């Protein structure tokens, strides 16, 4: 790339300080920061180099770049990681059709949008995992651990460590697939302890018949709110809408991914959702108190967090 071509008015280049050493730093910074391409600040897009100079807290205009001249590639990466908390976003596809799944493609499009804004993303296909049915034993309430030993434990750790989630399911008789429902049923202590508090979710649904995806989206929105997550947005499309609708859905999904990353970075507050989340939090706290002698782990969890 030509560093001069990327810097606009008011930048170091336009101020006449883009000398040869600085060019080297710009190129070095670029190579350390490909994951941050198209990062936006105040709704404005910048080049890789401009983003990195912002992220490591060096003013763009009329500054001495001498401190950077001694930094190695690894040092710059270390500075970037220290200054910017990388977002982790997990996509969960509940369609059993693998690479043929339209739902999977839309989930991936959301993840691509988030990735373009600096997020680290991962896509999981539920159909590839062995997740058994919940047997309502109540062990998770008592100990915080599930009695079952399968792939759910690994997936659950990823869910809890993620900053954002992208949930995708096709319409199966006016609801999510069996794979999605089985996973949700294994998350009972998640709702009691509101363990997705502070996270953001995008829900994606597809259907054959016109409008049938709406029920699926409504269901997933309600579930994720009950778990404590904000809903950044949702997207649905049906086969009856035609090929053009699918193409448009892909574009919308990418934009939703960008918005999801922005929400996480800015810690966006949705006022109406916040009211629901506060109500849910109080409701489940009271429920846990009522069964404190049986739901030992959950009571201890809320005690540890001062019931906040």
Functional labels for PLM-detected ranges:
Residues 15, 61-62:
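Cysteine-centered motifs
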Residues 196-235:
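Short, glycine-/small-residue-rich phosphate/pyrophosphate-handling segment
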Residues 20, 31-35, 63, 72-73:
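Short, low-complexity intrinsically disordered segments enriched in A/P/G/S/L with frequent Arg
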Residues 1-12:
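Extreme N-terminal basic, low-complexity initiation segments
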Residues 76-169, 174-182, 188-189, 251-261, ...:
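N-terminal beta1-alpha1-beta2 submodule of the flavodoxin-like/Rossmannoid cofactor-binding fold
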Residues 27, 46-50, 73:
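Low-complexity, intrinsically disordered or signal/transmembrane-proximal segments
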């Amino acid at each position: 790339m030509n560093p001069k071509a990327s810097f606009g008015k008011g930048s170091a280049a336009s101020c006449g300080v883009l000398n040869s050493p600085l060019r080297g730093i710009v190129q070095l910074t670029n190579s350390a920061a490909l994951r941050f391409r198209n990062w936006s600040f105040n709704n404005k897009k910048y080049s890789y180099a401009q983003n990195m100079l912002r992220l490591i807290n060096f003013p763009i205009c009329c500054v001495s770049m001498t401190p950077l001249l001694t930094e190695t590639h690894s040092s710059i990466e270390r500075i970037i990681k220290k200054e910017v908390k990388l977002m982790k976003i997990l996509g969960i596809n509940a369609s059993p059709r693998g690479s043929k799944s339209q739902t999977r493609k839309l989930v991936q499009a959301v993840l691509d949008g988030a990735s373009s804004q600096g997020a680290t993303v991962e896509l999981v296909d539920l159909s590839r995992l062995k997740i058994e049915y919940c047997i309502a034993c109540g062990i998770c309430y008592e100990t915080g651990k599930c009695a079952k030993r399968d792939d759910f434990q690994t997936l659950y750790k990823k869910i809890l460590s993620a900053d954002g989630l992208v949930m995708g399911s096709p319409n199966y008789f006016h609801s999510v697939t069996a794979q999605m429902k089985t996973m949700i049923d294994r998350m009972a202590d998640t709702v009691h302890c509101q363990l997705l508090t502070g996270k953001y979710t995008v829900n994606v649904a597809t259907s054959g018949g016109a409008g049938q995806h709406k029920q699926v989206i409504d269901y997933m929105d309600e579930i994720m709110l009950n778990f404590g997550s904000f809903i950044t947005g949702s997207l649905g499309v049906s086969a009856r809408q035609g090929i053009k609708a699918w193409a448009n859905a892909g574009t919308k999904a990418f934009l939703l991914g960008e918005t999801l990353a922005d929400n996480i970075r800015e810690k966006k507050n949705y006022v109406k959702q916040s009211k629901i989340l506060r109500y849910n939090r109080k409701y489940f706290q009271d429920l846990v108190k009522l069964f404190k002698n049986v739901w030992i782990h959950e009571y201890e969890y809320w005690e540890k967090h001062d019931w906040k």
